Amino acid sequence: MRSALLTILLLVAALAVRAAEPAEEVQRMAVRLMGKSLADYIEFRQIEADGDVFELHSDKNKIIISGNSANSMAMGLGHYLRYCCHVNVSWDADEKIAMPKSLPPVDKPLRRRALVEHRFFLNYCTFGYTMVWWQWREWERFIDWMALNGINLPLAITGQESVWYRVWTRLGLTDEEVRSYFTGPAHLPWHRMINLDRWQGPLPMAWLEHQEMLQKNIVERERELGMRPVLPAFAGHVPEALKRLFPEARISRMSSWGGFKDDYRSFFLDPMDSLFARIQTMFMEEQTMLYGTDHVYGIDPFNEVDPPSWEPDFLAEAARTIYSTLTDNDPQALWVQMTWLFYIDQAHWTQPRIKAFLGAVPRGRLLLLDYFAENTEVWRKTDSYYGQPFVWCYLGNFGGNTMLAGNMAETGQRIASALADGGCSISGIGSTLEAMDCNPLMYEYVLDNAWSESLSLKAWVDSWADRRVGKAIGQNREAWQLLVDSVYTRSAALGQAPLTNARPSLKGHGNWTTNPAYHYNNKVLYDAWRKMTQAAQTNKRVTNSMAFDLVNVGRQYLSNHFIVLRDSLTAAYNRRDIEAAAAVGLKMETLLSQLDSLLTVHPYFSLQRWVDKASSFGTDAADSIYYRRNAKTL
């Protein structure tokens, strides 16, 4: 039975979400991004429409942006900035926005309708590899970026440890037991996915309090801009110490993960145990009281770990029970789950097991994220997830890797094919990136595909090139077309990283996480870099976006060339040519020095920025040392 408290909380949350005026919220965003003097020339109007729609037109000296919601109007503003103003708005708060002195008119009226209901963004891992040390300044820019790109279903899992702290202490665990159960901040994504406990814990109480405050700001702003934050819910992960209080509870140890010792393995409560429903109710009460709800919950049991049983009946009953504990507390609940587990462990997740698991939830109440669809479309292997709705997702980055990569043309073709063949099951387009990486064009391209059936790749790339420098420059367009035709023709893969990042060796690349292989001619990359440099000289000014591109393409070229030098060193060593080895070694040292100098040009590539942001969370010297160490061990 739903508690009276939770019912009241759900009603209050629903009223709070509806309180803001959409046009006013988007106007405030415009002021944040471009300043009041320019934003005053833009008027936002809310219109009635069937589905998500935005319209653009000029009226005298005003730019009129209309939409059915704050999110649609924000997407309209993003379209205007990108295609009319040649302005790039980065997700990185350190990158300044180069606005024109005056706003250009809209050449001809434009109307766009979203092709899908859901535009999803983020991944549990992003909250470790990229966002863990963010303050409100970084989050504010990023939420604006999401709105400008039409995202309306963002993962929102910050601050959940504060909720869990309340739940576990209510059940009787001590402060030390609870905070020691959590990992250090940078590893929390894998703790939340039931992979890892206790690593670099205990988690400081000041961290829990700060993240709670931050999450309140995050979900408030996301709702203001027409998004439905995907909040977490209980998936079965419990502290080992819970066995002390509930010795009869069916708590099992999960399989080992990621090479961590047994001391760090997680524990799972059988969903059919009566304690499961009790914990779910407590969690949803506490979370709704703190953060409200939009009735969308992310639950990902069995991610990269084995369930207690592989029997289809168990998997079906687990899914059925998890879902019922959601709807017992929130009748409108929509369960969102990533389907990485079906891809990464295909040997165990056979079709009968997947069908049993998915079929146990009423059709339409489980939204599946096809996690790595640019490489493997699980929806095609599962008869469109046996009727459950899904979001076609571009992954694009593993582990915060910094290789230029992405299969751009193929991605566009796959999205078009999914929209044509997915039937009533295709419900969204999005991205499950593990980190915000060095290929930002891929994500904006994917999200633009949610609003256009006939997106010309060449025209899109030209527009991208223009907004990187603020106007159309031939050399820059040519540079980006070279990159798209060579570098961006193959999807990102696990373990990609430049050889300069690997431990020194005469052959190979050491660990699987530092695979430097690339499929294109490095001379083409150099030609693109040269054309970008010429464009910068033609422009007589370097925007922040162009500085990023010059560093990004240049450091990839130098990193690729380092392989040639290393292999030359190995050849000289094998033939015992000391003089040649010394000469090549000097070239390698020079290249590494040049690479370091190049990377200092843009803060996005700075390790020091990462470490300093972590250190800033410390309330004293010991705290700062703890956070710095945690940041360096990810």
Please provide the spans of the model-predicted regions:
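Ordered core of a single globular domain
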Residues: T543-D596
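Active-site-adjacent substrate/metal-binding segments within catalytic domains
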Residues: V116-Q135, M146
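Catalytic-core regions of glycoside hydrolase
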Residues: N88, D92-L103, L122-T126, A147, ...
